[in-house]
Curated annotation (Swiss-Prot):
Biological processes, Gene Ontology terms: telomere maintenance via recombination
Family membership noted in the UniProt record: Belongs to the helicase family. Yeast subtelomeric Y' repeat subfamily.
Alphabetically ordered keywords of this record: ATP-binding, Helicase, Hydrolase, Isomerase, Nucleotide-binding, Repeat
Transmembrane segments: none
Domain of life according to the entry: Eukaryota
Protein name, entry field: Y' element ATP-dependent helicase protein 1 copy 2
Organism: Saccharomyces cerevisiae (strain ATCC 204508 / S288c)
Length: 1681
């Protein structure tokens, strides 16, 4: 409806307009920067106007109004500027675009826009002359002459989507969550041709943001020169402004409709559904307590070093102590006073008691320890933010939460003297004018907030010291208390911020960023199957307060309206929803308003129940002496927080519980598959049988046998049961988590969480793999279960439930893994209520042996019939000694499994080729189906994936991948409907449940019967299974200790033999779904077989090879799709142009009489395209050149029955094509180039004298073009049919057409016309960067010599070096990041502009420290999506950058080129300030080897240790054999996450540091590994016991940790005077490997000296080991100085 108001359909762009608009897309970064600078300058000048009383009404200030020129933060101006870029471009080209035709028809004498003057005034990087621009804006607002028409068109154009705007921040994530886009609106010119791709309209939310930006620009620009601002008056303003406000109001209303989330009430779970995602009380509590656990874990790290008072101690001693008064007026004051904090209300005697003391030597407080304190407190800030977010209930917007302050003029954190809870008075609003809201925290969260302010923040202040100066002045902070705010230093600002604001990132010098905050949202709660984003969570919290917590509307109208206002809904909400006329909290008295809000918070606190889980005394307090005594008594053990669990009434088990569970899971129509399934569920749930084994056929529903009992157990209120499920492989883990978490009936989490953190009290089922089951840590956790539960929950009603082992036959059949299962025998099985073992391939013999192998008694002597439900007579012996009851459903049903699958055994010449044929045929018949291919080796898996991905989307898995990668890929294949084929070894055959799976192909000649059954069993509802073997190569090789491979012959008979079923060999019914029998197959499977057979016959008749199948099957990944000139691609080794097959193309024209001529390049082995005309009787004869690999194409005249035969020139290896035109007597000329193996075809139309290369036959309305790429082994054929109004390129380009649905760029005449600007731009860039056809790098471009480049070379710089969002956009050309039709890459380009932009960014990083580089990234934000524009921006400073590098890195080049040698004796500061600089080379080496020996012995995580001296254990790191496992070990302990959040590594991409361990440093790695022998010789020479020096990955971890350790680097650069700062990791690694002269003039590597300095920092003495926390502003004493 809004788009009708904007009249979008009348905005028509013609061909010339498109040519002009291409300038904007080619230079978008430039126009982004231009618009930002113009708005910034206008706003700056407008804000400097004298005070103006003019106001305008807003939604929040409807009565008094808000100032017209609003105060905007720089970040807001930046985003507004980027949104304005397209419209600024329109204004600068108003004379060239046809949409401004009304303006262009101005009469003589009417005012015109001088676009040339505008460009001169505005286009400099920092525009200062904006007077003329301001006058134009005023004239447009006043509709002077026809200038109003310009603004009218620009406003209507706001409804068009000119492409993606800037990203980042909470609001942008919310935008991306809105999926209801408007339909595409076509734009047609006067010739009926769709010409412009700018037809996808803006969403209402984006349109509203665009109008916000336009309004801000109009107001600011007009205010620069206007005498007054009456034109913006609501009553007497100009008509244009009133029309803009009408537009804005309509858009705002539609935005509200669009943003209405699908929220439905779910009473059964005490929650709501938000966009299909369950959000309830358990979701909130799970998230909250996970954050609390993270806070406690970080507190434990501090407690290891200090005697930390607990949260309970501080709450009891101070917060709930009635001797401490917190009576003070609420709200901030205008002056910054020293006592404007509740800290000053705490008596001095309590301040001294709470001070933490060092556990270690009281005289040691090292720089390393201070750094550890700072980092840990920064990390626990984020979980505390989330705790507050959920505790207040009525949600905050993120900026509101971010600006919580406990002191200063913006203070909003108070302590209520009556309830002793924390109260938050906030008044944040988008317009900054909302009345304050009061929200009260519960007791538990209040204790944590109070503890953070009184203890942790003061620790952090002392650890940072008085010299801390990371914060700069920013508009969000109030700098008061200084006579001249402009003279305030960064140290002053940092001091104010630390003593005022709660949520800081002290490492970066900023408030906690949204990107850091939202990381928790992506991972928590761990048991939630679907995570909500921040906007959905906000709406969900409002809905919970409205439906689950809120009062009844009929009786508590004002109470309910208060709840809405506390969620920051506008005053219109009260009127529209509740019938209250303009209700607001100002409508009632101040006391009533406070009471209403306090009662709303109390309702939320009671509903959420956080205080009931936290044991603290509200009536009694502890004296100071008691706490002191407690500290002395707890010198070795800190006091734990006590929790109690609510006592719940006991509820007996009932057979109806299983039915109710099934209805919860599957709906009210749930029924059991058969009676066997019902009785087995009851046996597991009701009977006392301690151990049960079940064998059921694949696809029977074994998961439901334990899933339903688990749901029934979880519904009981008397006891909390915690169960465990284990599967054999990691690939099953993701599938199990997805299946068991559906509908939110169970709280599911990985077993690794239990092993690392213990039971969280929320999770019902932990899921893991066999390796977890066998781990010592899991065994220890189970052994100590009762003690842990008693200490943690203070109750015994949390018990171990079921131990479930799926596919347990692997314990016996997986011979190669049996050594890994040894730890299972140590598990205390008796601790579980019941053990359940499930398998589809475990006959009695296999089951019995498998159970005995893990330490159980085995099966009972007699199998139990399914109908027997006897209670056990004697269970006193325990589960481990009690025999397991076996339920064999296969024997009970007497049906051979897998009869529903059609099994085919084929012997073929080539297994991969035959498999590809089958897959392509399947996807032609069933395009949405999926398939699994089982290969025999890991190499074969990767080869198949590499060669098949050109045809369809492939996921491949094998055992060498890391666990996380396996889980990720499996989940992707199961959930992503576009993935077609899963290729893997036999580990993909067990337990995976995949919808749309219709085919399984097995290429492994050594599969045994179990692996065969498991693989075929993936076809749940029928399908096809092919066993492909090579002819004359099948050999049943019996591997030692394992089942023999399957034999050639009837598969069904082998299955019967395995299960012990009656043989039917030679009898009726022998073949079930095999050997051609289709009797037992479903109708759908039979139909699929018949369709496959018909397609095979059709292909055989047409004699089509596998590579000539219709290209509609050849589904390419979207990331591989690129246009003609996108030939340089650093992200992929292969580039397929025009979505065509790289090796062959086949085109059949069934509707037109077209002649297709293909052109073959002699340098490639290409196959030409044959054209078949079904409407004529003409015969096409193909002739083959015996001397080349090319196939000629014959051309047949449609209008005659003659046959045209192609001739072959054997001597020149050339192919000639003859073409005859029956309409004329002219014959085409054939031309052969004898010097090259090329085909030259010339066609002459008898009606004209012109000769064309791409021939066009006007009588057939067909155009045929042939394209040859001389640098690749590909032939690209593009065919366009002018008589059909559709895209003629149907060879896999459907998805491209979906992205650009209305741009027909294949129209040849239009293509040439529309690409003129692109060609011109391409030529300019090629001239500006002439060496991109070679292996050029940006240092060459800057002018460095080859010997300098050798040492400054930027290796390891790729797309992952760039931060997220910088040159990393998807769906665009990978070489230049532009739309494909505007691609400026050129054929033969080896180094793309995008790669050069990466390297240019790295060069800028070379010259800047962390803070300067962060500011630089903000400055170049207009170019984040435009690497070509950034290169232009970069090249302007080319000479300056070259000179700066020469100056800054002269010392580096001198050292790395060995022209200078570092000597420690030349460093005066080093000799005076460090003992290391007085050591001999021998002593430095001994210290180095000792450090590594200690790290190895204690299994300390290396990177973490050198980063901040934190001695975390990581055994897997030291046992890792390859880089992948090593990186996984680091991920498990959270090293990379900590690096990104707390160090400069956050300024690179998320994968950058991880990839340093894989491929980037091969040369340095080789050098280091060659030096290992020399290290051993040095150890022997030193007379020390030879110890293993670190392997490469550990050594690299050390250097990365030192590089990111800011404290260490500052110390090293201070002591070692010959070096300066380097900001790139490659330079740091090269520098660390140079040799230095020690005090005795012996040479040692610099990295050994680094380790010695690092060790010295860890043991530096400081005067006092106790934090001097004087809770006052004038404390000037810094600990350690």
């Amino acid at each position: 409806m809004v788009y009708t108001l904007f009249q979008v359909h009348t905005l028509k762009f013609n061909r010339k307009d498109y040519d002009t608009l291409s300038l904007f897309y080619l230079n978008r970064g430039y126009y982004n920067e231009l618009s930002f600078r113009v708005l910034e300058r206008c706003h700056e000048k407008a804000s400097a106007r004298p005070n103006d009383s003019s106001t305008m009404r807003t939604f929040t200030d409807f009565v008094s109004g808000a100032p017209i020129v609003r105060s905007l933060q720089k970040s807001t101006i930046r985003k507004y500027g980027y949104n304005l870029a397209p419209y600024m471009f329109l204004l600068l080209h108003v004379d060239e675009l046809s949409i401004f035709s009304a303006y262009q028809a101005s009469l003589p004498g009417e005012k015109k826009v001088d676009t040339e003057r505008l460009k001169r005034d505005l286009c400099p990087r920092k525009p200062t002359e904006i007077k003329y621009f301001s006058q134009i804006c005023n004239d447009m607002m006043n509709k002077k002459d026809r200038l109003g028409d310009i603004l009218h068109i620009i406003l209507r154009a706001c409804a068009l989507n000119f492409g993606a705007g800037p990203r980042g921040g909470a609001g942008d994530e919310e935008d991306r969550s809105i999926t209801n886009e408007e339909p595409i609106i076509p734009s047609v010119d006067e010739h009926g041709l769709k010409v412009c791709k700018l037809r996808s309209p803006n969403t209402p939310r984006r349109l509203r943001k665009t109008l916000d930006a336009v309004k801000a620009l109009l107001v600011s620009s007009c205010a620069c020169t206007a005498r007054d601002l009456d034109i913006f008056d609501d009553n007497n303003g100009v008509a244009m402004w009133k029309w803009i406000k009408i537009l804005y109001h309509e858009v705002a209303q539609e935005t509200a409709l669009k943003d209405s989330y699908r929220i439905t009430l779910v009473p059964s779970s005490d929650g709501v559904s938000v966009c299909g995602k369950l959000f309830n009380r358990e979701y909130v509590r799970g998230f909250y307590f996970a954050c609390k656990a993270q806070f406690d874990n970080l507190w434990e790290e501090l407690n290891d070093c200090f005697y930390m008072p607990t949260v309970v101690d501080i709450a009891s001693l101070i917060l709930r102590n009635r001797e401490v008064l917190f009576r003070e007026p609420k709200r901030g004051i205008d002056e910054y006073l020293e006592n404007d904090s509740f800290l000053q209300m705490i008596p001095v005697k309590y301040r001294e008691i709470v001070l933490p003391k060092l556990r270690r030597d009281t005289n040691k407080m090292t720089a390393a320890l201070k750094n550890k304190v700072t980092v840990a407190i920064d990390e626990l800030t984020v979980p505390l933010m989330w705790m507050i977010h959920f505790a207040v209930g009525y949600p905050y917007r993120y900026p509101e939460l971010q600006l919580l302050a406990f002191a200063g003029p913006q203070r909003n954190v108070y302590v209520d003297d009556t309830t002793r809870r924390i109260q938050l008075y906030t008044d944040y609003n988008k317009n900054g004018s909302s009345e304050p809201r009061l929200k009260t925290l519960d007791g538990l969260t209040s204790d944590y907030v109070f503890y953070f302010v009184t203890v942790l923040r003061q620790m952090q202040i002392c650890a940072l010291g008085n010299s801390y100066d990371a914060f700069n002045h920013d508009p969000w902070m109030d700098v008061v208390g200084f006579e001249d705010p402009d003279q305030v230093t960064n140290r002053d600002i940092s001091r104010i911020v630390l003593y005022s604001y709660m949520f800081l990132n002290t490492a970066k010098g900023c408030l906690v960023e949204y990107a850091t905050f939202r990381q928790y949202m992506r991972e928590l709660p761990k048991n939630a199957p679907q995570k909500l984003n921040f906007r959905e969570m906000r709406q969900g919290l409002i809905a919970l307060g409205r439906h689950c917590v809120g009062s009844r509307f009929e009786t508590d109208l004002y109470e309910s309206a208060t709840s809405e206002l506390m969620a920051n809904h506008s005053v219109q909400t009260g009127r529209n929803i509740y019938g209250v006329d303009s209700f607001s909290l100002t409508s009632v008295s101040g006391t009533t308003a406070t009471l209403l809000q306090e009662r709303a918070s109390e309702r939320w606190i009671q509903w959420l129940g956080l205080e009931s889980d936290y044991h603290c005394s509200f009536s009694s307090t502890r004296n100071a002496e008691d706490v002191v005594a407690g500290e002395a008594a707890s010198s070795d053990h800190h006091q734990k927080i006590s929790r109690v669990t609510r006592k719940r009434p006991r509820e007996p088990k009932s057979t109806n519980d299983i039915l109710v569970a099934g209805q919860k899971l599957f709906g009210s129509s749930f029924e059991f598959r058969d009676l066997h399934q019902l009785r087995l569920c009851h046996e597991i749930y009701m009977a006392d049988t301690p151990s049960v084994a079940v064998q059921a056929p694949p696809g029977y529903g074994k998961t439901e046998l334990f899933h339903l009992p688990l749901i029934a157990l979880a519904s009981k209120g008397d006891v909390k049961y915690v169960s465990f499920l284990f599967v054999p492989y990691t690939v099953l883990l993701a599938n199990c988590m997805i299946r068991l978490s559906r509908c939110g009936c169970l709280n599911v989490a990985p077993v690794r969480n239990f092993i690392e953190e213990g039971c969280d009290g929320v999770t019902d089922l932990y899921v893991g793999i066999y390796d977890d089951l066998a781990s010592t840590n899991f065994t220890d956790r189970i052994a100590a279960w009762e003690n842990i539960v008693e200490c943690t929950f203070r109750t015994n009603n949390v018990k171990l439930g079921y131990l479930i082992v799926d596919e347990f036959h692997n314990f016996e059949t997986e011979v190669y893994r049996q050594s890994q299962f040894g730890g299972i025998t140590n598990l205390d099985f008796d601790a579980f209520e019941k053990a359940i073992f499930l398998s589809g391939t475990a006959p009695e013999a296999v089951a019995d042996a498998a159970l005995q192998r893990i330490g159980l008694t085995g099966l009972a002597k007699k199998s139990m019939d399914i109908n027997e439900l006897k209670r056990s007579e004697d269970l006193s012996r325990g589960l481990s000694s009690y025999p397991t009851r076996m339920f064999n459903l296969i024997k009970e049903k007497s049906e051979v499994p897998l009869g529903h699958v059609h099994k085919i055994w084929k012997k073929v010449e080539s297994q991969p080729e035959e498999a590809l044929k089958l897959l392509l045929a399947l996807f032609e018949i069933e395009p949405e189906s999926k398939a699994i291919v089982v290969a025999s080796t890991t190499n074969e898996v990767e080869e198949l994936a590499c060669s098949w991905r050109k045809y369809f989307r492939v996921v491949w898995i094998h055992g060498k991948l890391g666990a996380a990668e396996k889980v990720s890929r499996t989940k992707e294949f199961v959930t992503d409907g576009s993935m077609r084929v899963l290729i893997g070894t036999k580990l993909v055959t067990e337990g995976i449940d995949i919808k749309q799976l219709m085919m399984v192909i097995m290429l492994d000649n050594r599969l045994n019967i179990i692996e065969l059954i498991q693989g075929v069993g993936r076809l749940r509802d029928g399908g096809l299974c092919y066993l492909l073997s090579r002819k004359n190569s099948w050999a049943a090789r019996n591997r030692k200790g394992e089942l023999p491979p399957i034999k050639e012959g009837c598969i069904t008979e082998q299955v019967r033999e395995f299960y012990g079923l009656e043989s039917k060999k030679g009898k009726k019914g022998q073949h079930v779904g095999c050997c051609g029998s289709r009797t037992d197959l479903s109708a759908d499977t039979v139909e699929l077989i018949e369709r496959m057979d018909r397609l095979a016959e059709k292909q055989a008749t047409a004699s089509m090879s596998i590579v000539a199948l219709p290209s509609s099957f050849q589904e390419s990944n979207s990331s591989d799709r690129c246009r003609k000139y996108c030939s340089s691609d650093e992200d992929s080794d292969t580039c397929i142009h025009g979505s065509a097959n790289a090796s062959t193309n086949a085109t059949t024209n069934s509707s037109t009489n077209a002649t297709t001529t293909a052109s073959t390049n002699v340098r490639t082995s290409a196959t030409t395209t044959a054209s078949i005309n079904v409407r004529t009787s003409a015969t096409t004869t193909e002739s083959t050149n015996s001397s080349t690999n090319a196939t000629t194409t014959a051309s047949t005249n449609v209008r005659t029955s003659a046959t045209t035969t192609a001739s072959i020139n054997v001597r020149t290896s050339a192919t000639t094509t003859e073409s005859t035109n029956s309409n004329t007597s002219a014959t085409t000329t054939e031309s052969t180039d004898s010097n090259t193996s090329a085909t030259t075809t010339e066609s002459t139309d008898s009606n004209t004298s012109a000769t064309t290369t791409a021939s066009t036959n006007s009588s057939t309305n067909a155009t045929t073009t042939a394209s040859t790429n001389s640098s690749t082994n590909a032939t690209t054929t593009e065919s366009t049919n002018a008589s059909a109004k559709e895209d003629a390129n149907k060879d896999g380009n459907a998805e491209d057409n979906r992205f650009h649905p209305v741009t027909d760029i294949n129209k040849e005449s239009y293509k040439r016309k529309g690409s003129q600007m692109v060609l011109l731009e391409r030529k300019k860039l090629k001239a500006q960067f002439p060496n991109t056809s070679e292996n050029m790098n940006v240092l060459q471009f800057l002018g460095f010599r080859s010997d300098e480049i050798k040492h400054l070379f930027l290796y390891g710089i790729d797309v992952y070096f760039c931060p997220e969002g910088v040159f990393t956009q998807y769906g665009l050309c990978k070489g230049c990041q532009k739309m494909f039709e505007l691609c400026v890459c050129w054929a033969g380009q080896k180094v793309s502009y995008r790669r050069m932009a990466w390297e240019a960014l790295a060069v800028e990083r070379m010259l800047r420290n962390d803070e300067e580089y962060k500011e630089y990234l903000e400055d170049i934000e207009p170019y984040h999506g435009d690497p070509v524009g950034y290169l232009k921006y970069f090249s302007v400073k080319r000479g300056e950058i070259y000179s700066q590098i020469q100056r800054n890195y002269a010392w580096y080049l001198a050292i790395t080129r060995r022209r200078e040698t570092i000597s420690v004796l030349d460093s005066t500061r080093g000799k005076q300030g460090s003992q290391v600089f007085r050591m001999s080379g021998r002593q430095i080496k001994e210290l180095y080897y000792k450090v590594w020996s200690n790290l190895r012995e204690s299994k300390t995580e290396v990177l973490q240790y050198f980063l901040n001296w934190d001695e975390k254990k990581c055994r897997e790191e030291w046992e890792a054999k390859d880089d992948t496992v090593f990186v996984e070990a680091l991920e498990k302990v959270g090293v990379f996450q900590r690096l990104r959040s707390m160090t400069s590594a956050g300024l690179q991409g998320p994968q950058y540091v991880k990839l340093q361990f894989s491929r980037h440093h091969r040369q340095l790695r080789s050098r280091y590994e060659l030096s290992l022998g020399m290290h051993l010789r040095d150890q022997l020479a030193l007379g020390v016991t030879p110890s293993k020096v670190p392997h490469w990955t550990a050594f690299l971890s050390m250097l990365i940790g030192l590089f990111c350790n800011k404290t260490f680097r500052q110390k090293l650069e201070y002591l070692l005077e010959q070096i300066s700062e380097v900001w790139l990791l490659p330079h740091w690694l090269d520098l660390a490997n140079v040799e230095v002269l020690a005090a005795d003039n012996t040479r040692v590597p610099l990295y050994m000296l680094m380790v010695a300095v690092h060790k010295e920092l860890d043991s530096d003495d400081v005067p006092d080991g106790r934090f001097d926390i004087l809770l006052c502003r004038d404390s000037s004493r810094e600990v350690g100085e």
